[in-house]
From Swiss-Prot:
Protein's recorded name: Shikimate dehydrogenase (NADP(+))
Subunit structure as annotated in this protein's UniProt entry: Homodimer.
Species per Swiss-Prot/TrEMBL record: Coxiella burnetii (strain RSA 493 / Nine Mile phase I)
PANTHER family documented for this protein: BIFUNCTIONAL 3-DEHYDROQUINATE DEHYDRATASE_SHIKIMATE DEHYDROGENASE, CHLOROPLASTIC, SHIKIMATE DEHYDROGENASE
Any GO BP: amino acid biosynthetic process
Entry's Gene Ontology molecular function annotations: NADP binding; shikimate 3-dehydrogenase (NADP+) activity
Length: 272
């Protein structure tokens, strides 16, 4: 039986095996899907071992997305743009193909599942790490009015804005540089939720129709989403749908079939 996996560290709480099991039942495909916890300094060896043992593909989670991109022989446009990979495909000729579907998953979840319009909207992204880098391309493809990246270290936000500046109106800065305006969409892309915290955002960023979205899901997303509710945001979503939509795109890459994501999202929401 073909083998697939999610590779990360930590990986114990990954929902990807549950999602792929649901896709497996829905499409009548049979395969094994494993969780592989790779040592922080042993990612390449873990991938090689899985590949040598017949692995056909792998989802990549933290902290290995940049290393997965470097490991690949060929890469999708989205992966090249972001310099990160969210999934790998092991091809028949022995090469490794890298894709980055994080941004695709986010945009699909916002626009298709939640009916949020991104075109000609103002978007604030909180955080300038790999997660932000992975979503900027697809967000810019949606033709927003502008994107502002804010980060504790302003130079990182400025650097990201510079990389993508030819794609649309985009700027970066620190929290003290934030313009006093109300954004249509605010996306939280830091890891502070793991510590039960959220960034030092000022009041006055949220309007009556604003949408707030945390790339994390469950308890990790709670601090930011609670702040959003307290500030009066009309729409508040965590990243569970993004994860499912991302995995649906990966499933299509591996199997050539696009699964129905709605029942899977509903199933996960009922159990989380």
């Amino acid at each position: 039986m073909d083998k697939y996996a999610v590779i990360g560290n930590p990986v114990e709480h990954s929902l990807s095996p549950v999602i792929f099991q649901a896709f497996e039942k829905q499409t009548n495909h049979s395969f094994d899907y494993l969780k592989i916890k790779a040592p922080v300094n042993g990612f390449a060896a873990a991938v090689k071992k899985f590949h040598d043992e017949g692995g056909k593909g792998a989802n990549i989670t933290l902290p290995f997305k940049e290393e997965a991109y470097q490991l690949a022989d060929k890469r999708s446009q989205e992966a090249n743009e972001a310099h990160v990979a969210s999934a790998l495909q092991f091809r028949e000729d022995g090469t490794i193909y890298a894709v980055n579907y994080d941004g695709l998953g986010l945009v699909q979840d916002l626009t298709r599942n939640h009916n949020i319009t991104l075109t000609q909207k103002s978007i604030l992204i909180v955080g300038a790490g790999g997660a932000t880098r992975g979503i900027l391309g697809p967000l810019l493809n949606a033709a927003p009015e502008k994107i502002v990246i804010v980060n504790r270290t302003p130079s990182k936000a400025h650097a990201l804005a510079k990389i993508f500046h030819l794609r649309g109106e985009i700027q970066g800065g620190g929290f003290d540089e934030l313009e006093p305006m109300r954004y249509d969409v605010i996306i939280h892309a830091t890891s502070l939720g793991h510590q039960g915290k959220f960034p030092p955002l000022p009041d006055g960023l949220i309007g009556s129709q604003s949408c707030c979205y945390d790339l994390s899901y469950g308890k990790i997303a709670s601090p930011f989403l609670q702040w959003a509710k307290d500030q009066g945001a009309k729409y508040n979503f965590d990243g569970l749908g993004m994860l499912v939509e991302h995995n649906a795109a990966v499933f299509y890459l591996w199997f050539g079939i696009y699964p129905d994501t709605n029942p899977v999202i509903e199933m996960l929401q009922a159990h989380l």
